[in-house]
Amino acid sequence: MKSLNTLVILTSVISTSVFAGAYVENREAYNLASDQMEFMLRVGYNSDMGAGIMLTNTYTLQRDDELKHGYNEIEGWYPLFKPTDKLTIQPGGLINDKSIGSGGAVYLDVNYKFTPWFNLTVRNRYNHNNYSSTDLNGELDNNDSYEIGNYWNFIITDKFSYTFEPHYFYNINDFNSSNGTKHHWEITNTFRYRINEHWLPYFELRWLDRNVGPYHREQNQIRIGAKYFF
């Protein structure tokens, strides 16, 4: 019974891949196609009722290159509507800033808890860049995209969880993705292990679709990170 109660508690929070309370997070990533590393530092807070906010700062490093700033980002979300104890509708949004310019996104999550050990979140998101880029016709325009994401959350044990996360992107204006088409996929597999009430390390394997130039290969990425809850 104790294990079942723990699973129920974990299920109530794993839908957004977070636990309640303030936390700091560190993550390192390596892209095998570009030979690029990314270092991320994040601070955040998640309330017991599901609302949250987080601040993110990243840096990138490539072989024989200097450490460069990636982006700063602030993101927040709120469980606006909960018609049943299994269904939650949650809007969210973010703004970011990097060397080329700023941008942001708005999204709507719909989460349904099918069982104590499985829940699914479907996310509809619009990504916007405030700066202009040169499109396929040689004109300046905003390289915005529409994104559909799914989060298949599985509670394996009271400590171990797994999330399967496929995302589909479609470019709104006349731009191609790195695979040479107007659309692409990004698929993430996340494995988490809850050591205790403070430490939550995780490991991610990602496929970021094929890059047709300049790398001409599949973009696979490995991430290793940990959260510390206060």
Curated annotation (Swiss-Prot):
The signal peptide stretch is: 1-20
Superkingdom of origin: Bacteria
Primary place of residence?
Answer: membrane
* Pfam families, sorted: KdgM (PF06178)
Q: How does it sit in the membrane?
A: Multi-pass membrane protein
From which organism does this entry originate? Salmonella paratyphi A (strain ATCC 9150 / SARB42)
Pull one GO CC term from this UniProt entry: pore complex
**What biological function has been recorded for the protein in this entry?**
Outer membrane channel protein that allows an efficient diffusion of low-molecular-weight solutes such as small sugars and tetraglycine. However, the specific substrate recognized by the OmpL channel is unknown.
Q: Any idea what this protein is called?
A: Porin OmpL
